[in-house]
Amino acid sequence: MKYRILMATLLAVCLGIFSLSAPAFAAKQTLTYDDIVGTGLANKCPTLDDTARGAYPIDSSQTYRIARLCLQPTTFLVKEEPKNKRQEAEFVPTKLVTRETTSLDQIQGELKVNSDGSLTFVEEDGIDFQPVTVQMAGGERIPLLFTVKNLVASTQPNVTSITTSTDFKGEFNVPSYRTANFLDPKGRGLASGYDSAIALPQAKEEELARANVKRFSLTKGQISLNVAKVDGRTGEIAGTFESEQLSDDDMGAHEPHEVKIQGVFYASIEPA
C-alpha cells in the first residue's frame, strides 16, 4: 500500500513539472472542437506567465525563425476629423461589430541576424489578414482589412539576446478590402460588371468617376511589437503591439480612414 502511495505521489509531481515546462501553445492543443466552439477561445493568443522575464540568446553564426506568431487586437481606434476647425484630428475608440474572428495566427518567417547586430523578421506565411468592421460613436461603420502581409520588422542594433527591452518595428502591405470580382450594389466592378451605372455623367465629375472606375489599391502600414515576456528555455515571447493602417476605400470610391490597432501578441523563436 505504501509503495502505491509513493508511486502515485511521484507520478503527480512529474505531471506537475511537465505541465509547468510545457510551451504555452500546448495548452490550446489539448482542447477539442466542442471545448472551443462558441466560446471565443479560438480568437485568443497563447499567453506566458508574468514570471517569464528571461532572455533568449542569439548566436550570429546561426539562423533562426519566428513561428506561431499570433496577434490579438483588443482596441481599434479611428482618426476622426474634429467639428471645430481649430482642433486637430485625433484617434477615437470604436466598437467592434465583427464576430470573434479578428486575430492573426500561425504567422511564420525568417529571423535574420544583420551585420550591425540587429534582427529582422520577414513574414512568409500564415493567417495574416482578417476582414474587420468597427462602428464609430455616431453610427458610421468602418470596414478594414487587419493584416501584416509581407511584414519586415527590425530591432535596434547590437542585440545579443531577446529580452523584455527588445522591440520590433517595421512596415507591411495592406491589400484592398475587396477583390477584383466584387460587384457593388449597382453592379460595378473591377474585372466584371458595368463600367458605369449613370447614363451620361457630367464631364470632370470626379466623385462619379471614383465610384465608376474601381481600383485595387495597395497601401502601407506600420507596426511595433514590444516584447514584455520571454521564456529563455522554450524560446517563447509575448508582449503588446500597435499598428497603423488605412481602412477600406470601397475600391477608390471614397477616402479611407486612418486606423490604429492595439493588442497583444505571442510568438516562438526556433533555430532554422
UniProtKB/Swiss-Prot annotation:
Pfam families: MSP. PSII binds multiple chlorophylls, carotenoids and specific lipids. Coiled coil: none annotated. It is found in: Cellular thylakoid membrane. GO terms for cellular component: photosystem II oxygen evolving complex; plasma membrane-derived thylakoid membrane. It is a peripheral membrane protein. Its main location: membrane. Residues 1-26 form the signal peptide. Keywords: Membrane, Photosynthesis, Photosystem II, Signal, Thylakoid. One of its GO terms (biological process) is photosystem II stabilization. GO terms for molecular function: oxygen evolving activity. InterPro entries: OMP/PagP_b-brl, PsbO. PSII is composed of 1 copy each of membrane proteins PsbA, PsbB, PsbC, PsbD, PsbE, PsbF, PsbH, PsbI, PsbJ, PsbK, PsbL, PsbM, PsbT, PsbX, PsbY, PsbZ, Psb30/Ycf12, peripheral proteins PsbO, CyanoQ (PsbQ), PsbU, PsbV and a large number of cofactors. It forms dimeric complexes. One of the extrinsic, lumenal subunits of photosystem II (PSII), which stabilize and protect the oxygen-evolving complex. PSII is a light-driven water plastoquinone oxidoreductase, using light energy to abstract electrons from H(2)O, generating a proton gradient subsequently used for ATP formation. Required for dimerization of PSII and for binding of PsbQ to PSII. Belongs to the PsbO family. This is Photosystem II extrinsic protein O. The lineage of its organism: Bacteria, Bacillati, Cyanobacteriota, Cyanophyceae, Acaryochloridales.
